[in-house]
Amino acid sequence: MTALLWGWGAEAQGTGKPRNIIMIIGDGMGHTQVSAAYLHQTQGSGDGSWNMGRFTHFGYSVTTSSDALITDSGAGATALSTGRKTYNGAVGVGPDSLPLQTILEKAAATGRRTGMLVTCEVTHATPASYAAHRIDRDLYEDIALDLSLAPLDWLVGGGRNHFVTRQDQRNLLEEMHKDRGFKVMDRSEDLLKAPRSSAKQPVVALVWDGPAPRISEGRDPGLMAALTARACRDLDRPAPIATNDSGFFLMIEGSQIDWGGHANDGDYVLAETLDLDRVVGAALDFARQDGNTLVVLTADHETGGMAINSGARDAQSMGLAFTTKKHTAALVPVMAYGPGAEAMSAMMDNTEIYRRLCGLWSLEP
């Protein structure tokens, strides 16, 4: 029964090495958040679809930071992006505050295209941990500067204000266009409708001044899935410095599952987890058609100590409860599909996920 629920009976996948890696992070997404979304979608008032059930390999991740049992998003994401434990509040630096090279940066250095897609500000802790290096996650304008210079080919999310309304009066988006040739867009609709840009032109679309609006506040439930498909389409070609079709690395974050947990708002958590499931569906659709793409889903930590206590399976009456408004040390799920997916079938430290991904690409960890 469990195998059927979670997709373990699906087509055989998992051996070999991937050309592309799509890393999906559900910020604050523990097993209970996944369970609630599954029950609602398949047995409650949902439409019955469940994309996370299409994964073929499953594991657990330990999320502790270097200085605490309970991590924050900066330390948790830095562990995933660099394979090193660091202190809470850090992004892309180690306990000694020195920069650590991320898997995104290593991908770019070896001729792969790179991208990030998030529902928070791109300067927030998780995306910052993949392409910035700062001792304090709250240094948003400094992080924006790092991102403007990072080896990114595709950057979509919120946080426009940190690039254009700055204390130093600089307009980083203009600089990215003039100095690095970025195609700058400010509406998701324009990005989705735009013809594919040239292989040598990177894209930045900061489509919200701050974070994306909540699903309950009007964000299109299909937007993130559509942007995921667009990201795969845009990145799936040789990088400008590559001599062959060397693949891509794409990090996607469902950022606001965490915020629902902090607010102890079960409906918020459920809506954002279901949104991430649609993102998973778009990524897996690409991976299945492509045949050379590894998709990994995990979390930086769990938020809220969420439990399902009673009630029905629909969002309005499911008995969702919380033990805290903060993060917890609960282990989080790891799910994978595609070449190399078998490497994710383990109970492992979050730093090990990075090491195994590097191994699949023959990168020095």
Predicted regions mapped to residue ranges:
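Metal-dependent active-site segment of extracytoplasmic phospho-/sulfohydrolases and closely related
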Residues: 31, 274-315
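N-terminal signal peptide c-region/cleavage motif recognized by signal peptidases
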Residues: 7-9
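Active-site regions of oxyanion-processing enzymes, predominantly non-cytosolic
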Residues: 191-205, 227-255
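Bacterial N-terminal signal peptides
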Residues: 1-5
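Gly-rich Lys/Arg/Thr-decorated short loops/hinges at beta-loop-alpha junctions or inter-strand turns
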Residues: 80-88, 204-216, 258-264, 335-337
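Active-site His/acidic residue clusters
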Residues: 125-130, 209-216, 231-232, 243-279
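N-terminal catalytic scaffold of extracellular/periplasmic and nuclease hydrolases
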Residues: 13-166, 172-196, 200-201, 302-365
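Active-site proximal loops enriched in glycine and acidic residues that flank catalytic Cys/His/Asp
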Residues: 208, 252-256, 261-263, 273, ...
